[in-house]
Curated annotation (Swiss-Prot):
Lineage: Bacteria, Bacillati, Bacillota, Bacilli, Bacillales
Function statement: The RuvA-RuvB-RuvC complex processes Holliday junction (HJ) DNA during genetic recombination and DNA repair, while the RuvA-RuvB complex plays an important role in the rescue of blocked DNA replication forks via replication fork reversal (RFR). RuvA specifically binds to HJ cruciform DNA, conferring on it an open structure. The RuvB hexamer acts as an ATP-dependent pump, pulling dsDNA into and through the RuvAB complex. RuvB forms 2 homohexamers on either side of HJ DNA bound by 1 or 2 RuvA tetramers; 4 subunits per hexamer contact DNA at a time.
Quaternary context: Homohexamer. Forms an RuvA(8)-RuvB(12)-Holliday junction (HJ) complex. HJ DNA is sandwiched between 2 RuvA tetramers; dsDNA enters through RuvA and exits via RuvB. An RuvB hexamer assembles on each DNA strand where it exits the tetramer. Each RuvB hexamer is contacted by two RuvA subunits (via domain III) on 2 adjacent RuvB subunits; this complex drives branch migration. In the full resolvosome a probable DNA-RuvA(4)-RuvB(12)-RuvC(2) complex forms which resolves the HJ.
This protein's encoding gene: ruvB
A GO cellular component annotation in the UniProt record: cytoplasm
InterPro entries: AAA+_ATPase, AAA_lid_4, DNA_helicase_Holl-junc_RuvB, P-loop_NTPase, RuvB-like_N, RuvB_C, WH-like_DNA-bd_sf, WH_DNA-bd_sf
GO molecular function: ATP binding; ATP hydrolysis activity; four-way junction DNA binding; four-way junction helicase activity
Protein name: Holliday junction branch migration complex subunit RuvB
Organism: Bacillus velezensis (strain DSM 23117 / BGSC 10A6 / LMG 26770 / FZB42) (Bacillus amyloliquefaciens subsp. plantarum)
Length: 334
């Protein structure tokens, strides 16, 4: 799969950059108004009662700020955050080591929590409910179970696939918050804030232009800003103007709706070879040279979100909006 400027996933280098941009409290966090308002109440209530915050599940598409919100929860509660991920916890012993190292009140953040296997989930259940850990010592007939007390802690889980969580795990979270895509106004504010952190001068119009092409995702907005900054430094006087931003984004092949060359290839392939569909997923896969699961999990969600694709029982179909976007005449439908 080609690397994409508009991908909502972060690589390891980008994760380091994101840490430097991360707001430290709810007041600094832009967007997700309802989620913030509810978390404010839950955090303040827990602090007033001098209790740990209830376990929190953050879910929604990648790149919307789940990790950032987890760190803010820890900051607002005045505690440390320990970070791990579902794939990194391979054995129950791995989870036991993490849990026994927690201090009272700590936040344990598990990213991609839907990827925990069942045996690890079973260790997690009593830890979440009763703050205890059941450990089996020995093997065979002489094996015995020992219960260890754990300090009270808050588990913050993050997932892009909430439907893959088992019901017993999902039901143990007291706070469930869905993160939504951001508005252009919110993304414009995020671009301006990031530019301030980078000490880059940017006008309102180019900040809006970058926001418009960011697919509703702060991670994409910040990535595009970094690339536009490169063009401003090399081709201009380091100030990001509307002209510089427009020229840079065109060179980067990110169009006015945030579609890149791969989106164009997929959509135009469906139009030119299959008259817009319906087309089966395997056929699209063979046409553009990508795995079916990559198309379904990576490319399709945004196209579905903006109404450019429809899933039907007979296959994928491009909508009239695609023809309008590419300035093509839509074929007559039966």
């Amino acid at each position: 799969m080609d690397e994409r400027l508009v991908s909502s996933e972060a690589d390891s280098h980008e994760s380091i950059i994101e840490q430097s941009l991360r707001p430290q409290n709810l007041a600094q966090y832009i967007g997700q108004k309802k989620v913030k308002e509810n978390l404010r109440v839950f955090i303040d209530a827990a602090k007033m009662r001098q209790e740990t915050l209830d376990h929190v599940l953050l879910y929604g598409p990648p790149g919307l700020g789940k990790t950032t919100l987890a760190s803010i929860v820890a900051n607002e509660m005045g505690v440390e955050m320990r970070t791990t991920s579902g794939p990194a916890i391979e054995r129950p012993g791995d989870l036991a080591a993490i849990l026994t190292a927690l201090e009272p009140g700590d936040v344990l953040f598990i990213d991609e929590i839907h990827r925990l296997n069942r045996s690890i989930e079973e260790v997690l259940y009593p830890a979440m409910e009763d703050f205890c850990l059941d450990i089996v010592i020995g093997k065979g007939p002489s094996a015995r179970s020992v219960r260890l007390d754990l300090p009270p802690f808050t588990l913050v889980g993050a997932t892009t696939r909430v439907g893959l969580l088992t019901a017993p795990l999902r039901d143990r979270f007291g706070v469930l918050s869905r993160l939504e895509y951001y508005t252009q106004e919110e993304l414009t504010d995020i671009v301006s804030r990031t530019a301030d952190v980078f000490e880059v001068d940017i006008e309102k119009a180019p900040a809006l232009e970058i926001a418009r092409r960011s697919r509703g995702t702060p991670r994409v907005a910040n990535r595009l800003l970094r690339r536009v900054r490169d063009f401003a430094q090399v081709l201009g006087d380091s100030r990001i103007t509307e002209e510089i931003a427009h020229d840079a984004l065109e060179r980067l092949q990110v169009d006015a709706l945030g579609l890149d060359h791969i989106d164009h290839k997929l959509l135009m392939g469906m139009i030119e070879k299959f008259s817009g569909g319906p087309v089966g997923l395997d056929t699209i896969s063979a046409t553009i040279g990508e795995e079916p699961h990559t198309i379904e999990d990576v490319y399709e969600p945004y196209l579905l979100q903006i109404g450019f694709l429809q899933r039907t029982p007979r296959g994928r179909v491009v909508t009239p909006a695609v023809y309008e976007h590419f300035r093509l005449e839509a074929p007559a439908r039966d």
